[in-house]
């Protein structure tokens, strides 16, 4: 056993041991900040390339889907390549995608580059965080690891648009964030190249039994679903032949995904991974989180832009508030589990309650003379509850599934939360807002367009309140129990590698 401070084995000896895990934490932060087209640059990209809002959203969704897909491959890559090789390749690939996407106006090419960037940024993030997991929790405790992990993951989700919009405001060019992230990723690659060496803790496993076609099919299935709800309003839903064709493709792709899963030896997602008793309720909870989280994307944006007439820089402060809320929620999970020593499942009720506070407060706050400061508390509470749900549902998923299926489970959860549910809820809210506006105008109400919009937004917030309160009542009446009385520990990488070697038949 190593004595003294935690050490990353791949670092050269002249790097101080106390500094090594912090360097990897910085690498993970940079990987998570990176992307293809950044949400904060949406309006500038639309204006320069004459793209529709739906086009830019679809490019961003390709990046989000790309993040969800590498999970079943991660350990196969970890046990075949070295830490140095993985980080160098991930940093250079994501940097290349960030650079190339600035110089093309082809939406399909932008989508492909965004998907590749999302795929490899998750690979780089995983390699960084898995390397320093013993520094984060020497006892291999998931109730410590996941809250700390989501401090970075969810923190970047809200911090990235805040940084992007400020940089664009200062330099008046949407490409500045791509240049900044390309430079940061090249710096990561340079530091890794100079300060690390190839290190293996076990003999490499053959890089075989990789279901690339399965990954492609599941990705296409998710993206066809997202396409339907992203472009639904633009093409008038099923009245368009494009939407009808998309539905047919979605059905056929889903059929091929299932048939391939059932009939090959090493599928992308194993059939056994779908058979756990509590998996479906867990995926429904992930869907509920995405439903509650999609309200700001349509209703809050319509309210702040169409009623309050706030600009992007004014509303950008809400991203910072949500970042603070995400950090507070993750740290509260840590406090609840390790200081108060309470059951992690009880936190789900607190998470539901704080998330429901958001639409309830917004319902009563909607006013044409509202100050931006009045939105701080509801946005904070929504982000706080969202962080609790992400942390605790991931812990519950890890407790539910054995380790060999856990990373497949993360992709299954990603099928729900990484794009599809968000796109569906945003599309339905957009349809509901248009329907409410048309309905209110047809009634001949004595209001101008702004007041009709405000009334429509309040009605949709009211419907969201009712759904959220109904779910909260279910949680109050139904005491969700942990999967087991004692939490599992993270297995060591040597143990995982030996299990994989035995499963694939590489050992005698």
Describe the residue ranges of each PLM region:
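Extracytoplasmic
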Residues: 2-7, 15-74, 124-125, 129, ...
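12-transmembrane solute porter fold
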Residues: 18-34, 39-40, 97, 268-436, ...
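A membrane-interface helix-boundary motif in multi-pass transporters
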Residues: 169-182, 231-241, 430-468
